[in-house]
Amino acid sequence: MPDMLVNLLKLPGDETLTDALRKENILIRRALTPDYYRVLPRITQLMGENAAGEANACFSRIPVSLFLATQGAKVVGFACYNATAPDFFGPTAVDPAYRGKGIGKALLIRALRAMREEGYVYAIIGGAGPVGFYESAVGALPIPDSEPGIY
């Protein structure tokens, strides 16, 4: 899986997407430190211990570099950035029962926007699995010779 590069100056808007999610009571928000003990086990369920370890690192940052998709008290998705390396997006996952609603795209755009607000101009998606998704969602480009990457 190649790493991918995203130009943060050309991110699409997400207002229509987040408005549609709100109608289903799904909110995209930055995690807060009090979420820690509730969120890490859920990330382990969704993606495994390695992802939970990366999310753990996100909670040590101010602001926390982790966004959540929630429906009520239930965490249905997450997206991290600056977890394993500076300027890297990921890991990210959405509960299989909630896929196809645009949650992953909304989390991606929200996290990349936060990176832009923190001064980054480009972001790297490390070991990008769904290359086509990242290309269409945010115009990400595969980085030549990026395999094997940091992961």
List where the protein language model places each region.
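Conserved active-site alpha-helix within GNAT-family acetyltransferase domains
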Residues: 1, 105, 117, 128-151
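Acyl-donor-binding surface of acyltransferase catalytic domains
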Residues: 1-23, 127, 148-150
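A short beta-loop-alpha structural element at the N-terminal edge
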Residues: 27-39
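A conserved beta-strand-loop-helix scaffold within acyl/acetyltransferase catalytic domains
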Residues: 44-96
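Conserved hydrophobic beta-strand within the GNAT/NAT acetyltransferase core sheet
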Residues: 89, 123-127
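Conserved acetyl-CoA-binding loop-helix of GNAT-fold acetyltransferases
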Residues: 94, 100-113, 117, 136
